[in-house]
Each structure stands twice: as C-alpha cells, then as structure tokens.
C-alpha cells in the first residue's frame, strides 16, 4: 500500500499499526482460566526455546491506575508447551468500578538489538465483566439543594440556565449554540450528527467513496422537523428534543438533551432507517468544535496510539494524556487519524485545568483534531494530494464522539473491504453520553463516576 511503498523515503517514525503487528506476532500468549480470576494459562509459542530469559509482570488497574502489581519468573516451559500460573492478587472489591489485569513479559538480559527490560508480550482482560460500570454512582439531595434549571423559549432560541451555566439552542436548526460554564463558552460549534470519516488508503482502494458516499453529508444536510422543550415540575430536569429528517437516506434522527441543575447534559442520539436500501456507515456519532485552548486530552480507553475496531488488541485500556495535536499521525496521504476505541471518558482541558468531560453510557470511539475533517478527507481526481506533513493547526478543537467507527480492513490494499463484524449496518441505533464542566480542582476520573441521569 501507500504507507509500505513510501517506507524507503520516510524518516524512521513508526506508524500506529506497528503496535498491533507486535501484539499479533508475540510468542508468549496469556489466557484467562474459567471460573477463577487468579489463575492464567501461559503458552510458549517459540519453536526452540523456553521462557527462562523472561520475567512476568502483572498489574491490576482501575481507572487507569495500578492498585496491585507483582513480578515473577515463568515456570520451566519447553517450546510449544503451556502451563498454568496463579497470580497472587488480592480479591477485587465490589465497588462498581472496572478492574483489569494486565500481563507483560520482559527480557531479563540484553541481547543483540534487544535491550534488557524490553516488553515482548502483553495481554489484558477485565476481571469483573459482570459488574455494572458506574454501579456506585449516586447523586444526593445535598448536591441539588436550592438548584434548579430555568428555561426560556423565544422564536429564535431555547435557553436553559442554572447557577453557573447557560445552554442555548437555535430553533432554526436545532444546534446547540452556547455551552457556558462560569461565563466561558466551551463550544464554537455545537453537536452535529456525523456519519463520515476521512477516507483511508484502504477505503479509497475498495471504492468506499462511490459505495458509501450517501453518508458524507448526511449529518450536515439533516433537515430540522421539530424542536421541543419540556421541564419537570420541580425544575430538576429540562429536556430539549430535536427531530431531523435525513431526506437522501429516507431516515430519521432524534437528538435529546437532558440538563440537570448542576449543568450536566445527557445527549442521546437515535437513528431510525426507512425502507431505502443503504450501504454501510463509515462512522455513527456526533462531532463538535471547541475553542483551541482546550488542547490537553486525557482519556480512559485504549491507547496511547490510534486504534480501531479491527485493530485494537495491541493498545491496552489505560489512562492517557496527550495534546490534541499529538493525536494526529502524518500519514503519507492525509486521512482518518487518531481514533481511540473503548473510551470510558475523555476530558479536554486548557492550561488552567478547566474544560469539558465526556462520559459514555457505553464505551465510545473518540478522536480530537486541530483541524476540520475536510482538511484530511480524500478528494477524488485532486492533483494536489494532501501530504500528512502538510496539515496545519487551526484555531479549533474538532471532537468526534462516536458510538461506532468502522474498522480499517487491510486483508489487501487493492479492493478488500472491512470484515462484516467491523462495519456499521444502517439499522436502528441509539447511544448516549454525558457532558460535564471541569474546574481545575476536579478529578476527571472521580467525576466520571457520578451518575446524574
């Protein structure tokens, strides 16, 4: 493909997919054992050597932070053999949080081209998958005392206000126009539905633009049908419901905003297809634009490199922080970049520590850029191809908050499509996430555990 053919003329910068290659190629494999959390199965896939030159390091993590860890030698294991190992971890508390076990194999000594302490294998799995995430989340009467949501509707706008916030919607197109917390507007453009991604090299090769182009402007061209306001009798919840028609797709879309007296906003999107036969969707989600100052991104999800539905096993779930510009990878030809899968929450903050927290009701796909999608999208027959290194920062943070993002494929680079299990079929879909303001005193991880709806 383009990336491979260009390797001889590129600087020695690793592409993000190398970490998935490393994971798939690893010669030490770890598996959970049914009905126990402490026992694991280790398989040595080497053809000739044992594992005496490697150390096993284990870590139990919650909210991206280690709460237990240890190190041990592997048992004596011949090539192509398996063994069971007991990890000496303590019981996992039933506190409603997610706990993950991460297993890593490191070299004990230096070898040609391989330093001592080099990670040669990694695996991670959740220890309490049956536990409900955010089970311990509560909101108390004390937090809501003397706080209400006030509403106002004019011919041009719907406005919701509270003690330290103001949220406004245009009645002309249903878009959120203000998200003010403590006098600062956190948006330059409000949430809009988005079904398109900047085409990857594999997308171009399999005629994705011709096959799925109906989705490119589906969100932008959505026609407002109605916008309604409802508030409960004690002013503890205000709801704005926006209904759209996707005319070319013969489908409908509903976005519901629920607002609590503390300024927390739950956003729910509901897509319903009609009878028209439609191709797969490149992505299913929403996007918004924030001021450029909110350029420090922290997320609890897979990382730190970009990853996708069919390319994510080499990127453990963890707590990561980077600038928004660091999310961008300069491929030879500019294209989709920076996606993170299985994101529990993401925070975008300015240098003062203020910003916005997004928490998914289910794990999200999230990406953030310093430019609009159009800057990296593929333009057919454009003689001036955009080199990844030519993309420039703009005065913005483009934030994608997706329920689904299709895989990248790659069985070959001359026509193979993404496997069906990693595509997005246009049936009925709905998802939700919550937005909350962050002060410089707020711990984003702890605030993400609050449940306001």
Locate predicted features.
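Short acidic/polar inter-strand loop motif in beta-rich domains
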Residues: 105-114
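Buried hydrophobic-core signal for structured, non-transmembrane domains
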Residues: 39-46, 87, 101-105, 164, ...
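Short, conserved beta-strand segments of beta-strand-rich sandwich/propeller modules, principally
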Residues: 55, 98-102
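Acidic/polar loop patches that form or flank catalytic/metal-binding clefts of enzymes
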Residues: 30-33, 114-116, 296-299
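Extracellular and select intracellular beta-sandwich modules with Ser/Thr-enriched
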Residues: 68-70, 118-123
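Glycine-centered loop/turn motifs
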Residues: 79-80, 117-119
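Beta-strand/loop-rich accessory regions of lumenal/periplasmic or secreted enzymes
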Residues: 88-96, 111, 126-453
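Substrate-binding clefts and catalytic carboxylate motifs of secreted carbohydrate-active enzymes
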Residues: 1-82, 86, 91-93, 363-398, ...
